[in-house]
Swiss-Prot record:
Its main location: cytoplasm. One of its GO terms (molecular function) is anti-sigma factor antagonist activity. InterPro entries: Anti-adapt_IraD, IraD/Gp25-like. Keywords: Cytoplasm, Stress response. This is Anti-adapter protein IraD. GO terms for cellular component: cytoplasm. The keyword Cytoplasm applies.
Amino acid sequence: MMRQSRQAVLPEISGNKTSSLRKSICSDLLTLFNSPHSALPSLLVSGMPEWQVHNQSDKHLQSWYCRQLRSALLFHEPRIAALQVNLKEAYSHTLAISLEIMLYHDDEPLTFDLVWDNGGWRSATLENVS
């Protein structure tokens, strides 16, 4: 079965609307990560339960995880023009990722850090997004 790609025609954005867009993207991504019925693969949504049963130091697993996450986010978030996913920490009880995001009509990269904490994802950078 072929997957349909979604393309969005986005309006030009300037000034303080860019800041609002960046905050909106981060807020929407955090909601997506914490949604129990998210369309993201289960490892990406529930994070730690599945992560703990695997060898977290396995570089192939880490690479696979980043590729899966990148693919899912690009599919579900049409406002992202380019995305790089990096694992910052990958231990049995800690999973921290960093998303380097380029948005359409925004020349500055957006860095969004997420940490799996007490059964859910949280962001240390959401309040600092501008």
